């Protein structure tokens, strides 16, 4: 790959619109009759959580963005998908985009010449709300409350307080090749393209686990987390999307090149609609409904040791 991930530079940014469907399923009720017929017992069979074993993707939409080098994507309210292209109109390199729910805005990371910035854009007016200058270029970002967590090109993990614009180190020592970051609860999840690893740490930077599944995941880039803590990762070199369990003990390939897929770069999981957006190198975006289904024997489940 060339230019860090072998990606070209494009100078536009687009938005696409899609219908959002929200499904709600009640728990299953089961009646059990005792053999002596003296009593009836009603049992509520609680629906099991979404797991690596029962996660099922159903493709709902295919979007041709007519662009390549999409470096970030976000699922926004009202069925809007936001895609971030490799360069903006000023010629600065852009990398990622994330949705900020608190003020209905998006944050875009960009930069060049060793300097970077995070630009906050109001979704309704599509006008820039604020631009925050940084002393280093920025890769992937994630939002939790009023804080943006981000990876830097000098391989550090930092946090930006949106209230006072202060910046703090989460991991101050240099880490090799951090690319994208996701957050869920009190955990952060980072991909490392160079070492082919996914790392989970707490909000203070203490490593909880590291996943290195070379058999199934190579060149990890985009990353996102569902409501149950399952971690979805785009494998650029391995041509697939892999889901990793919250305890890192199990993982499974959900999508491969056989699923009309080639070189996935970024993805985003919408926890409110249980939808997964995946974008590949050629600029094709795929929208999936994520549901609980029967375990597919054709999909290999790996147990990590």
Identify the residue ranges that each predicted region occupies:
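Short loop/turn segments that connect beta-strands within beta-propeller blades
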Residues: 122-126, 161-165, 202-206, 245-249, ...
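Loop/turn-rich, solvent-exposed surfaces of beta-rich toroidal or solenoidal domains
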Residues: 191, 195-200, 208-246
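Beta-rich, blade/repeat-based domains predominating
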Residues: 67-76, 90-105, 134-152, 173-194, ...
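Protein-protein interaction scaffold domains that mediate dimerization/oligomerization
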Residues: 1-60, 74-76, 179, 249, ...
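Blade-level signature of beta-propeller repeat domains, shared across WD40, Kelch, NHL, RCC1
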Residues: 262-305
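A short beta-strand motif characteristic of beta-propeller blades
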Residues: 58-64, 83-90, 126-133, 165-173, ...
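Structural signal for beta-propeller blades
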Residues: 115-118, 156-158, 196-198, 239-242, ...
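Short loop/turn segments immediately following the C-termini of beta-strands
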Residues: 111-113, 153-154, 193, 236, ...
